[in-house]
Amino acid sequence: MVFFRSVSAISRLRSRAVQQSSLSNSVRWLHSSELDLKSQMQEIIPEQQDRLKKLKSEQGKVPVGNITVDMVLGGMRGMTGLLWETSLLDADEGIRFRGMSIPECQKILPSAESGEEPLPESLLWLLLTGKVPTKEQANALSTELAHRAAVPAIDALPSTAHPMTQFASGVMALQVQSEFQKAYEQGDISKSKYWEPTFEDALNLIARVPVVASYVYRRMYKDGSIIPLDDSLDYGANFSHMLGFDSPQMKELMRLYVTIHSDHEGGNVSAHAGHLVGSALSDPYLSFAAALNGLAGPLHGLANQEVLLWIKLVVEECGESISKEQLKDYVWKTLNSGKVVPGYGHGVLRKTDPRYICQREFALKHLPDDPLFQLVSKLYEVVPPILTELGKVKNPWPNVDAHSGVLLNYYGLTEARYYTVLFGVSRSLGICSQLIWDRALGLPLERPKSVNMDWLDNFTRLNR
């Protein structure tokens, strides 16, 4: 068996690669004056195509990891095997969008006139171009998305189905409008131009998913009274408005929510599913619908609703004024019964999720006296030491799901069953951005090699 480098050496190289990636991306945080996003992409894509060709020809045989039997048996966890340009996840620092941390995004990206949180449109511009947009560019993109947001009637959906089932079905219903499928079937488009109809589909899809998602919400929980889109509002504010929440703070929360949930590199189930299906040249509607079906799984996108339900169970059994000592006992009882504390731990992160921290800062500013937020704060103090003492958890710290439900609940969006739909709307920005780059870079059909246990037994026996 050939071991290219030790695991520790690979780990050091990966850490250095993350640092270098952040450094190289920082160079691209420069503004440009072009207001049209597609024109920006037309300038950038040829440079990145050349970069990929050079990387493949000059460094194509350089090993980037050491595959172990554990990785094969463990769902490929930790295996480096996917190109994902829009974001990179570091175990210590958390997610970086094109090299920018969440605090940097909050500080640098344009916000609404009356708000402080980044506009999702400004993050979308960053994800696609690697450049920070001007306020004018973000506003222009906001206007463009509003103009693209027309959605055909989807009343055939059963109103009793799970919100995610309705949401994914609604996205599939939009697929008949795919520009990519139309161009491919006509056969008059070259491979180098695949990204252009993909761009049209991606922006149309990003524009339309809040309309579909709010339609599902109003249909299920508000007697079907639909609130039309207001093209004077930005993306996050419009989504909040169409759901039926028009307070300035809820609109600000929605901007923050969409931004921090937009992307989390390419290895998670929804991102990988979207990339995998897209690699077959399925259009963005089909690819994103596949991503949503992955997101609907209990091990991926349902955690945010499970956290809120668990917190409400704590209140129901122990009261809102539960002390830290009582809370410790409750957490131990939960763990000793074979259950987990939802919202704690992460497959990659080894510190508190920065997405949790920025939500906590929002709560400290806007709802410091809310009883459920105070309970979340107590859990932040109580749970990590207990999980550390337990000794079976690599990351005892809270993740993004530990906080989001309490914020949404405070502003009146109390239907926890719907929360994964909000997650899905947010993920459209990252997944669709990467689909454009997948086609722009000409990435191939994904087709990993699989083996059986006999193969693994024989291989390990020969290489002991």
Curated annotation (Swiss-Prot):
It comes from the Eukaryota. Gene3D superfamilies: Citrate Synthase, domain 1, Cytochrome P450-Terp, domain 2. Its EC number is 2.3.3.16. InterPro entries: Citrate_synth-like_lrg_a-sub (IPR016142), Citrate_synth-like_sm_a-sub (IPR016143), Citrate_synthase (IPR002020), Citrate_synthase_AS (IPR019810), Citrate_synthase_euk (IPR010109), Citrate_synthase_sf (IPR036969). GO terms for biological process: citrate metabolic process; tricarboxylic acid cycle. The keyword Heme does not apply. It is found in: Mitochondrion matrix. The keyword Transit peptide applies. Pathway: Carbohydrate metabolism; tricarboxylic acid cycle; isocitrate from oxaloacetate: step 1/2. Disulfide bonds: none annotated. Citrate synthase is found in nearly all cells capable of oxidative metabolism. Belongs to the citrate synthase family. This is Citrate synthase 5, mitochondrial. It comes from Arabidopsis thaliana.
